[in-house]
Amino acid sequence: MAVGKNKRLSKGKKGIKKRTVDPFTRKDEYSVKAPSTFANRDVGKTLVNRTSGLKNANDSLKGRIFEVSLADLQGDEDHAFRKVKLRVDEIQGKNCLTNFHGLDFTTDKLRSLVRKWQSLIEANVTVKTTDDYLLRLFAIAFTKRRPNQIKKTTYARSSQIRAIRKKMTEIMQREASSCSLAQLTSKLIPEVIGREIEKATQGIYPLQHVHIRKVKLLKSPKFDLGALLNLHGESTTDDKGQKVEREFKEQVLESV
């Protein structure tokens, strides 16, 4: 008989299953909060493994990026074609405080804008806000018919496209460089920059569907907790009572 391991002895009993542990028992739920520039601050919930040993739950949450529909943040279905990226910068209790990280259009909206018989004009610019956020803004615009136009096509000449693109970059540079990231977000929601471009280029060629279709965050400044808390409507300073000065009056006892 050959010397070796007896295979029949090493086999375990049939029917005994390995005990499975539910992974969700080791997880905690955190609320994701959007900055106060948006109407609805409750983004949703996120799960993370509970703090154990050297692994801290807060470190796992910081840096997470959430893509949310602007319609949910504003409570208005007219903004459904725009997506906002929010990045977790700080954890306060069970709340994840986020900051603006970017903006984009849905693919179906972009595809629906592109049509025949018109010119598509695109421009992008890299700009720094007053609070040192480096952003790249992408704009898109389409030509439209002039009043009382009989011709079917609305193609702009190359010289007109160059002039329109120059105006687009100038307006984006001016609007973004003169404000903070929070103020720029407030401009992007009602599409203030798009309307400015449409108004400024009216003399060159009439435009329609002028949008800032994408905002990309290239570089962030050094993290400032106070600025983030102010963005979320909170404060780091403690309310302290004022010192009240009173004149000392010696108490006179009438009876002993």
Curated annotation (Swiss-Prot):
Name the PANTHER family for this protein: 40S RIBOSOMAL PROTEIN S3A
What GO terms describe the biological role, i.e. biological process, of this protein?
translation
Q: What is the lineage of its organism?
A: Eukaryota, Fungi, Dikarya, Ascomycota, Pezizomycotina
Swiss-Prot/TrEMBL keywords: Acetylation, Cytoplasm, Ribonucleoprotein, Ribosomal protein
**What main location does UniProt list?**
cytoplasm
Q: Which residues carry this modification: N-acetylalanine?
A: A2
Q: Which family does it belong to?
A: Belongs to the eukaryotic ribosomal protein eS1 family.
**Top-level taxon of origin:** Eukaryota
Which InterPro entries does this chain map to?
Answer: Ribosomal_eS1 (IPR001593), Ribosomal_eS1_CS (IPR018281), Ribosomal_eS1_euk (IPR027500)
Task: Name where it's found.
Answer: Cytoplasm
Gene behind the chain: rps1
Q: Which GO terms describe its molecular function?
A: structural constituent of ribosome
Q: Where is the composition biased (Basic residues)?
A: 1-18
Residue ranges for the region (Disordered) are 1-20
Q: Give the UniProt entry's GO cellular component terms.
A: cytosol; cytosolic small ribosomal subunit; extracellular region
Q: How does it assemble?
A: Component of the small ribosomal subunit. Mature ribosomes consist of a small (40S) and a large (60S) subunit. The 40S subunit contains about 33 different proteins and 1 molecule of RNA (18S). The 60S subunit contains about 49 different proteins and 3 molecules of RNA (25S, 5.8S and 5S).
Enumerate the Pfam families for this protein.
Ribosomal_S3Ae
Name of the protein this chain belongs to: Small ribosomal subunit protein eS1
